[in-house]
Regions:
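A helix-coil-helix interface module used to build multimeric assemblies
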Residues: 1-144
Length: 144
């Protein structure tokens, strides 16, 4: 995890956060989740009869991990909106889907659902560690 985009950066991270937890809240995980949500949205809309081409869906799936955060920052300076910056960036990476990315969605759909997914992943990580801790304490208690 040497790529700075693969870890959440905060002054207290090095002191208190594990690498796994930093990864959960990293920019690449957050913005990759945005793209996966847009893909799920487009797939659902296509199933409901909205004209979304297979080519558009294929391009979106192929570009899900193609994150150029420098270019996203340029778009964000231009639009002054983080979600719209990434809509345009994803459209650059999946040109056939440019007109349908984020179709019918709000920024809250993307941001709120991403937060829920990342917090769920973080809680699963915590749960795993708590279970290990309880098992170790139980073994220690039985031994002593």
């Amino acid at each position: 995890m040497d790529n700075p985009l693969d870890r959440y950066v905060h002054p207290l991270c090095d002191r208190y956060a594990s690498r796994e937890m930093q990864s959960v809240f990293s920019p690449s995980r957050r913005f990759g989740t945005w793209r996966r949500l847009w893909i799920a949205l487009a797939e659902s809309e296509a199933e409901l009869g909205i004209p979304i081409s297979a080519e558009a869906l294929d391009e979106m799936r192929a570009a899900v991990n193609e994150l150029d955060l420098e270019k996203a920052a340029e778009y964000e300076r231009r639009f002054r909106h983080d979600v719209m910056a990434h809509v345009h960036l994803f459209g650059d990476d999946a040109p056939a889907a440019k007109g349908i990315i984020h179709l019918g969605a709000t920024s809250a759909f993307i941001g709120d659902n991403t937060d829920l997914i990342l917090h769920r992943d973080a809680l699963e990580l915590i749960r795993t560690r708590v279970v290990r801790c309880v098992e170790a304490l139980s073994a220690f208690a039985e031994e002593h």
